């Protein structure tokens, strides 16, 4: 991964992040029968470790990871890192995205924060993806900022995606997803 130097002003880059890692990973069965999807290994490194390392690389100082399905696998793995910047938010049952974030709010605080899907894998180009996202943030005009990739640029993906973008850049949720 190509990582550029951090900008001189890190004021706009969130210092806190959450990795959503509580889901069952049903679309990846049978791979996820015994291992949570974020723990799948790609090129010698778990998806979860890739996300953690990417977040720390851009200056994030605290990461909350929600766990539920096969939680002990993630708990043991993260524990082996011996890094007190990582906090686990355990859910008896998966609370879905909104519930998981709400459950972790006491750890997330009131400042902007990143939320990363625990099964997301991306390759940075000339610019670090998270840094690029943070640079687009404008707290005067935004409550949330969503990073999307056009399906035509997604490797090994043959679906329609969750959103439709019109020629003016306006997003709408695909009807079949509602």
State where each predicted segment sits.
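Conserved N-terminal catalytic core of the sugar/cofactor nucleotidyltransferase
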Residues: 2-19, 45-117, 121, 128, ...
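Short Gly/Pro-enriched turn/cap motifs at secondary-structure boundaries
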Residues: 8, 30, 93, 153-154, ...
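Short catalytic helix/loop segments, enriched in acidic residues and glycine
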Residues: 34-47
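Short N-terminal binding/cap micro-motifs at the start of the first secondary-structure element
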Residues: 25-28
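A conserved hydrophobic helix/loop-capping motif in glycosyltransferases and polysaccharide synthases
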Residues: 18-22, 40-41
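Conserved core of the sugar-phosphate nucleotidyltransferase
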Residues: 82, 123-178
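Conserved beta-strand segments of alpha/beta enzyme cores
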Residues: 38, 85-87, 170
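Conserved G/P- and acidic residue-centered "switch" motifs that form tight phosphate/ATP-binding loops
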Residues: 23, 37, 119
């Amino acid at each position: 991964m190509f990582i550029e130097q951090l900008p001189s002003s890190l004021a706009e880059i969130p210092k806190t992040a959450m990795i959503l890692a509580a889901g069952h990973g049903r679309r990846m069965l049978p791979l996820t029968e015994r291992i949570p999807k974020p723990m799948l290994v790609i090129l010698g490194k778990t998806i979860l470790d890739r996300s953690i390392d990417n977040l720390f690389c851009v200056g994030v100082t605290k990461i909350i990871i929600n766990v539920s399905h096969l939680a002990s696998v993630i708990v043991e793995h993260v524990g082996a890192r011996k890094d007190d910047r990582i906090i686990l938010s355990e859910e008896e049952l998966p609370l879905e995205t909104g519930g998981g974030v709400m459950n972790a709010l006491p750890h997330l605080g009131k400042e902007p924060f990143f939320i990363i899907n625990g099964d997301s894998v991306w390759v940075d180009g000339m610019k670090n993806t998270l840094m690029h996202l943070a640079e687009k943030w404008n707290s005067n005009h935004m409550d949330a900022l969503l990073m999307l990739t056009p399906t035509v640029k997604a490797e090994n993906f043959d679906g329609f995606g969750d959103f439709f973008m019109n020629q003016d850049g306006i997003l709408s949720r695909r009807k079949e997803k509602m």
